[in-house]
Amino acid sequence: MANVVVVGTQWGDEGKGKIVDWLSEQADVVVRYQGGHNAGHTLVINGISYKLSLLPSGVVRGKLSVIGNGVVVDPHHFVSELKKLRDQGVEITPKVLRVAENASLILSVHRDLDAARENGISGLTIGTTKRGIGPAYEDKVGRRSIRMIDLAETNTLMAKIERLLRHHNALRRGMGIAEIDPKTLYDELMQVADEILPFMDCTWRLLDERHRMGQRILFEGAQGASLDNDFGTYPYVTSSNTVSGQAFIGSGMGPGSVHYVLGIAKAYTTRVGEGPFPTEQVNDVGEFLGMRGNEFGVVTGRKRRCGWFDAVLVRQMVKICSVRGIALTKLDVLDGLDEIKICIGYEIDGRKIDYLPSCIEEQARVKPIYETLEGWKEATACTLNWEELPVQAIKYVRRIEELIGVPIALLSTSPEREDTIFIIDPFAD
């Protein structure tokens, strides 16, 4: 049975939530494999908006949903998000939601450190959500994390907290921040331990069992591949690997378990926070895209930067992630434009290149090379059939396919999950 990885191919906010929700109808299991509660999904179901930032999208559909070991989990946010969804009428029990026992936790010390750095102590503003994601991953790599399973081992938890705070209190002293007493952190964790522990499981075994049963597994990525810690616009990236390969490490399933990688891309480009953005439009076009596309962050409410579709960037991530097909979203936002531009290459220091360099200084110097296409006046919003799209919209989509080297598998024409043109089935064996 085919399993599918969904990965963003831009800087996040590509519309993965809707696509994952749409695909989850065919899936038996939905897995989050990286990130934390710093990236949000908005699902619109029967006119009701559900905002998720930590829980997998499958929980809203009653599918078995797994938070894998590659995710850093804020236990207090977990409880809060759970309550909000339950208040909206979503039934969530340990039968449909499981959390990896070896997932690392986000604590208040991580949020403190994240905020202190972002507020200027480090001298580098990345544009993080200040939710402690980066510091939590630092502790994971530094082998001092408090993990889910530690909440169940109360006789050794205090010793682990003390070891963690030997590192954090030294940092806090250097930054002029008051030190944290181990008992304070212990009490914070005990406040929510009884609420989160029933969801804990050895999830790699659970996923292996479901795979052997022939169930379809959908791996849900957060953010976008261009924010990847290795392959993104470093240092203006997130703290985890967001490319498709992380699905294996962050879930405990091997590469042989995945049969299709579906990339998600907007019909234009957006970015939140700092960092290079070659096709950004700081003009009327950017304002048009932002207002028409309602480009404000789900988690932070921050206004997103907007620009033309960057085929160079998407093609690069298609190759790195082994993407076989693209779900193109928000085509309807482009309705009414007289002309639409696509970036087909870059120019830097007088020479042409067909990739985004790794050097941040070079990334800032690249100039986009545009191809201009005729726009369309007809509405694509809510279109359900390929044949009903305006001729120029079809030409635009076909040109994107040519430039990025893979076909468009799904085409989204509104936030509603039903408004999706189905071209290729990612779950087909």
Swiss-Prot record:
Enzyme Commission number: 6.3.4.4
Ligand binding (GTP): 12-18, 40-42, 304, 330-332, 412-414
Keyword rRNA processing on entry: no
InterPro entries xref list: Adenylosuccin_syn_GTP-bd, Adenylosuccin_syn_Lys_AS, Adenylosuccinate_synth_dom1, Adenylosuccinate_synth_dom2, Adenylosuccinate_synth_dom3, Adenylosuccinate_synthetase, P-loop_NTPase
UniProt GO cellular component terms: cytoplasm
Residues holding Mg(2+): 13, 40
Binding site for IMP: 13-16, 38-41, 129, 143, 223, 238, 302
Note describing how the cofactor binds: Binds 1 Mg(2+) ion per subunit.
Residues that span the membrane, as ranges: none
GO biological process: 'de novo' AMP biosynthetic process; IMP metabolic process
Keyword tags: Cytoplasm, GTP-binding, Ligase, Magnesium, Metal-binding, Nucleotide-binding, Purine biosynthesis
Pathway(s): Purine metabolism; AMP biosynthesis via de novo pathway; AMP from IMP: step 1/2
Active-site annotation: 13, 41
CDD domains: AdSS
Enzyme class: ligase
Main location: cytoplasm
Subcellular location: Cytoplasm
Binding positions for substrate per the UniProt entry: 298-304
Requisite cofactors: Mg(2+)
GTP-binding is among the record's keywords: yes
Source organism, top-level taxon: Bacteria
Family: Belongs to the adenylosuccinate synthetase family.
HAMAP family registered for this protein in UniProt: Adenylosucc_synth (MF_00011)
Database matches in NCBIfam families: PRK01117.1, purA
Designated name of the protein: Adenylosuccinate synthetase
Taxonomic source organism: Bartonella bacilliformis (strain ATCC 35685 / KC583 / Herrer 020/F12,63)
Name of the gene encoding the protein in the UniProt record: purA
